[in-house]
Every structure is written in C-alpha cells, then in structure tokens.
Amino acid sequence: MAEVTENFATCWKAAGIHIENQVQGEFKSWLRAHLSPPFLEHLSFRLGNQLFYIRIQDVDDELEIPGSLKGLLSIANGSKGHACLMPMKKISGSWSCVAPDWGLISAETGVNVNPVDLISDELIEMTDWELQDFAVQVVRQNLESDGKKLMSWQGSPNADPAIWFVGDDGPEWVVVRTFRHGLVKPSKPANWNKIVSSLNNTGSSGNYAEVICASPDDVFDPTGDNAAKLFRGQGLHVRYLGLEKISDPLN
C-alpha cells in the first residue's frame, strides 16, 4: 500500500492540530490519528455521544489525497456518525483551514459542522462497526505490547483480514471478530473456510482473534443471556485471550 506524500502529511498534521485547538485541555477523543493505510477517513474522533469522520480536501486541488469520499461515507454511515470534509489551503508554505470554527463541513449537506452543537443526552447503542474497530484496537495494542511491528489495520466489519503484522518468519494476518456478551456464542464465521482459502493465496501465516465486549454494568456470566446493551461513550469490559494460530486453516 502506497505511503502518503510528505506534503499531505504536513497538511494532515495541521488539520489535526486545528481540531485539538477547539477544546480546552488535552484532546483525548481521537479514534483515528495516524497515517497508516488503508484510508476510509483521514481523522476521526468521538465527542460526547457523537462520532465524526473527516476527509481532508485541498481547495486548490493540488494535493495528492489518499482514500475517497465513498470510503468516508461508508464508515460514517456504518458507525452512525457524521461524514465531514475539512477544506485546507496552503498559504505562504503553511496549511490552514478554510471553513470557520472547527473547520468542518458536512459531506452530505455542505453546511458548517460544530460538533458541540450535535452532542445530546441520548443513549446511542454502539454499532457493529464501532465494536469491530474497538476490537481491532484491543488486538493491535496487545501485539504492540508483545513487541510486534504492525504493518496495517482497519476496523471495517465487512473486510478481512483486520490486521497485518511482522511475525517471526515474515508477514502475518489476523482475522478479528467481536461479540456482544450474552447475545451470540463466539464462533468462527460461517464462511471461515472461504476467508482462509482466499488469504492462503498471500503465502503468509494466519491468526484468528475473538474479542468479547460487555457493558460496565454487566458481568461475564457464561450462563447469562440478558446482557446489558453497549452504549457509546460508557466504556466496555473486554475478554480477549490472544491469537489462535491457524495451523490447519480449513479444519
């Protein structure tokens, strides 16, 4: 996967700093704040009970920009979040936001977006996309703790594998599945053989990871079937037992 250009990286950094400057104190709400491909969005964050996904634009159309508007809309719609464009302009060698305030405009309506105005007290149940993205974060942080070098990762529940990393003998892939505690018994997907058969064509070793999520108001009761719903911004209890090596993938 192609690396981003230095010019885009500089623009991206300026956009991120602008977002951080909109809040008092340290900004701790980033969902995506890295330049590792693939790119559905360039930046994303949670504020209150709302999610915001950002695609950077160059108003002069001279910047080589990774990803697409289609990708932005897919992750925003899949997560029940807001798809935002962030127009940027290079002036005297420095990148600046064109739109006022947060610098965001709706990708669907073209109106200015102020994230603070969209926060509410509504309890919003986490989408499958949010949970998958969270599960991938759990697995990759565990890999990094074990000293593994990550190559790429993505949080879409509709794409496999979720993670590539450098193993002891070369690149390895990880298929990640997340489960809501008490709703579905964890198991490999029904099309598991097809997934693995396809990934075997890469010639790389494979792994499988299950992440089970429960509400902070819930407990991991193996016999329970009345698990509490998972609401955005309320935290999660997690059960993750590590990678399962796929030594005989089609069995």
Language model region names:
Residues K90-N114, G206-N251:
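Domain-level recognition of nuclease-like catalytic cores that cleave nucleotide substrates
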Residues I119, E130, I163, R177-F179, ...:
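Repeat-unit-sized solenoid/scaffold elements
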Residues G16-P38, M88-A107:
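Short N-terminal signal/transit or membrane-insertion segments
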Residues L35-D58, D101-E125:
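Short N-terminal secondary-structure initiator segments
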Residues R32-G93, D168-E172, V176-A228:
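Catalytic cores of nucleic-acid endonucleases
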Residues E144, F165-D169:
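Short, surface-exposed basic-aromatic patches at helix termini and helix-loop junctions that form
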